[in-house]
Amino acid sequence: MPKVLFVSQDTVKKRCQIGIGDDLDVKKYTVSLATYDSLRCPVRGSEIGEEAMELICTEDESFRAIRKAYTYLADHDRSKYALKMRLIQAGFSKEASELAVRRCVEHGYLDEPRQLERAVEREANYKLRGRYYIKRHLAGKGYSLSDIDRAIDLLVDRGDIDFDENFDRLCEKRGIESDEDRTSLKYRFGYKI
């Protein structure tokens, strides 16, 4: 049966690091102080039962998944679905991944409506892409079509996006004047389907 080799508490961050194993093999697990208290505060040398070990492993995995999610979101914006799938690909369980995504949403690190607005505005005003291209592109990143439509409509209503003006800028940038070429460009950049 595994034994507790060390316990390190951090009352500010409200978590505890427990070293469990034998003299040759030590693994560190991070749990909340509440979980540590629920285990009846095991001290150095005490044995850990199967049930307690399962609880410690589950909570440690959730803690690591949350930290990894913060790292992924620091790189760039992701949808809830994309973040969850990335965590699962990294080897975390579905439950730990879902918990990490929920925690990111609760703390405001993952705000899909705001992310969508920024992404739609960037695609429309800077990359000069049309409504249908934007929908296809962002749906491929894991955002729902209804949320994408809502973000596009909101930005158009606020006057932040004018697809007709953007198309004229695109034609001017490309030096296109004939109607045939303009029609071709409309389809290619998603102004028409």
Which positions does each model-derived feature cover?
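An alpha-helical, amphipathic repeat domain used for nucleic-acid recognition
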Residues: 1-193
